[in-house]
Amino acid sequence: MSNIQENENKETCNIKENENKEILKENFKNKEKQYFSSLRSPYSACRSVDCFKKLYTINEGAFGVVYCAQDKETEEIVALKKIKMEREREGIPITSVREIKVLMELKHDNIVQIKEIVLGKNINSIFMAMEFIDHDLRGLMEVIKKPFLPSEIKTLIQQLLNGVSYMHDNWVIHRDLKTANLLYTNKGVLKIADFGLAREYGSPLKPLSKGVVTLWYRAPELLLDTEIYTPAIDIWSVGCIFAEIISKEVLLQGSSEIDQMDKIFKLFGTPTEKSWPAFFKLPLAKYFNLTDQPYNNLKSKFPHITDNAFDLLNKLLELNPEARISASDALKHPYFFENPQPRDPLLMPTWPSSHKKT
């Protein structure tokens, strides 16, 4: 990939009024319209992508391509995420506006930080410059030979819950937590990334999109087609991640939504009026011919973990979202206070970068 030559007179972004209007035609929610309007002033002084030297492509996903790049002025290495615009006729995709808004507002050690918005040659070329992090947890677990030690697992889950608790305290649901969206620095710090599906929520709860969260990490209430859901959907994903870090295998690998739900029932048992009263009111519940399977078989998959570790895992993977533990309560669980204690992040293992240079 050729390097972009640095312009002697550093370019700045100068969005014209009619371009702003074009962007704002997007069918945003009122709060998001207001937020994007507030970005017009910062955009007028944002830097050009010419200020960065693209080194290699990290990955390409549904919402954009991510490059490893170097700031030509400071020589700092950053992750440069180009927002996909191919199908957008009326401005920036709503998912990208939400991601920018959320990342600008959330400031936490366990959440990836956005540094600035960067523009290309025209309004349809927009980048987010974010802190560069060496690994994603999924890729790392695929290449390391040894599993994480119990103290290291405890540190990773504690950091994950710290980030999730902070998100939920600030009225944000991530809606796509999985090991591939967790980054791991060479200083032993875990960071939550990829906020393309994140949404702010409020009280009372309002209907939200159902088609969220990668299938293997999707909570049962979402699989049963509910539109009214809570941050508990993120907690289910945390439970799946916890199990995956322990075993280095994805816990529930369904081939479809029906198969995923079937695997959940086989592992955790079928719900009853007592264990999950609202289950029978969910849109797709009536289509399941439930065989009576009252037993939770999760312990059989993790026979060697401590009782406290299993208890926390079980509370994170509670079928009934109303009974599922919160992130803040999970951080107070005895699991984090028994031996071995969580390992200091500075003593966590490190590895060469797992990003493939393409």
From Swiss-Prot:
PANTHER family assigned to the protein according to its UniProt record, in alphabetical order: CELL DIVISION PROTEIN KINASE, CYCLIN-DEPENDENT KINASE 11
Residues binding ATP, per UniProt: 58-66, 81
Active site positions, chain numbering: 176 (proton acceptor)
Pfam families recorded: Pkinase
EC number(s) reported in the record: 2.7.11.22
Swiss-Prot/TrEMBL GO biological process terms: protein phosphorylation; regulation of cell cycle
A GO MF label: ATP binding
Keyword Nucleotide-binding: yes
Name the UniProt record assigns to this protein: Cyclin-dependent kinase 11
Keyword annotations of the record: ATP-binding, Kinase, Nucleotide-binding, Serine/threonine-protein kinase, Transferase
SUPFAM superfamilies: Protein kinase-like (PK-like) (SSF56112)
